[in-house]
Design a protein with these regions (language model features):
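Alpha-helical cap/lid subdomain in secreted, periplasmic
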Residues: 1, 33, 91-252, 256, ...
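Bacterial Sec-dependent signal peptides at the C-terminal "C-region" and cleavage site
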Residues: 15, 25-35
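Serine-esterase "nucleophile elbow" of acetyl-processing enzymes
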Residues: 31-78, 94-106
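Short, solvent-exposed loop/turn elements at domain surfaces
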Residues: 46-51, 84-86, 291-292
């Protein structure tokens, strides 16, 4: 007996087979792409900065990518002047949350602007500040991500300043007439406690960024610690002809130094991230995330007679020719290549 099959009868199994093939391809693609993303939310001490016109300010989050191999992507969403409250109310948190995928990480660091008195930003430790931190943690976990809480980096405050908090927005030291002592003085108070408390309560990794940066600045002293910050004399750098006295925000050297220390602390607690940890002597990038934006300057800074590894990030580069006496090894990252 001859059985006739309609086009519809044939289409059904073909559709099923096609669906299965596409599913297998999708799974294979997912497994092949083993990169994970570290999302970052926070304020100006972490944020990416405008580097045009030789501007020197950097957030430590700009430099974090230097300390991971190509298996980790750092996606920094920190924004100048934001508190945990304004970051949520402006829709910035939703935009980040929509991008988070299972297996990703989220670094949360607020406090500098939660201290501000204006209603758009102010939160209170123990109540509204803690509630916002819990929300970040809970919603990140719901997306399959691993949240990481940090408290605020320290302000360089060696005097009995009453204006240190307000000076963040001014990018100035309104108390520069006060004599500086030898001991760093805290300006954050209970805003340092909330991230630790929420981390313990919710079983989240906590990095004490305040202690780490406090110890760094204290060890460098009241004069040496100026090298970390946006403290320039008039005419010292073209982008600041009148100079600047900013004890909160980092310059290139400071941001890179802090990023390295916080990455070390992070990798000590998160084994999966530690697998991707890398360290090089010098970092070069055209997007402001390096210590230098050109190879010639990077090579010139390398000491003679000592092996130095220079990481070159992204883009096309001309390999320097004049390297007499320099034992330099280049490592190309993020798709960088020599012409």
């Amino acid at each position: 007996m001859k059985i006739k099959k309609s086009i519809a009868d044939l289409a059904a199994p073909l559709h099923t087979i096609l669906t299965m093939v596409l599913a297998v391809l999708a799974i294979s693609s997912f497994r092949a792409d083993k990169t994970k993303t570290i999302f970052m939310i926070g304020d100006s001490t972490m944020a990416n900065k405008d580097i045009s016109g030789d501007k020197q300010e950097r957030g430590w989050g700009m430099m974090l990518q230097n300390y991971f191999d190509d298996g980790i992507i750092v996606d920094n969403h920190a924004v100048n002047g934001r508190s945990s409250k304004s970051f949520i109310n402006e829709g910035r948190w939703k935009a980040v949350l929509d991008r988070i995928m299972p297996g990703d990480y989220l670094i949360i660091q607020f406090g500098h602007n939660d201290e501000k008195t204006d209603s758009a930003r102010h939160t209170t430790p123990g109540t509204t500040f803690d509630a916002n931190l819990r929300r970040f943690v809970r919603e990140a976990r719901e997306k399959g991500a691993t949240p990481i809480l940090m408290n605020s980096v320290v302000r360089r405050n060696f005097s009995d300043s009453k204006t240190a908090v307000a000076d963040d927005d001014l990018r100035d030291n309104s108390s520069k007439q006060l004599a500086e002592g030898d001991t760093l003085i805290d300006t954050h108070g209970e805003y340092l406690v909330s991230p630790r408390r929420v981390a313990k309560e919710m079983g989240v990794v906590f990095v004490d960024a305040n202690k780490i940066t406090h110890d760094l600045e204290q060890s460098m002293g009241k004069e040496g610690s100026k090298k970390l910050h946006m403290i320039f004399k008039p005419g010292e750098t073209p982008s600041l002809p009148d100079g600047r006295q900013d004890n909160t925000h980092y310059n290139i050297f400071g941001a890179n130094k802090v990023a390295g220390l916080l990455d070390d602390a992070l990798c000590r607690q998160v084994a999966e991230l530690a697998k991707h940890h890398v360290y090089y002597d010098i970092y070069v990038s055209k997007n402001g995330s390096g210590q230098f934006d050109d190879l010639e300057s990077a090579v010139a800074s390398a000491p003679k007679g000592r092996k130095v590894t220079i990481a070159v990030s992204g883009g096309e580069w001309k390999k320097p020719e004049a390297m007499k006496g320099k034992k330099v090894k280049f490592v190309l990252t993020r798709g960088a290549k020599f012409l």
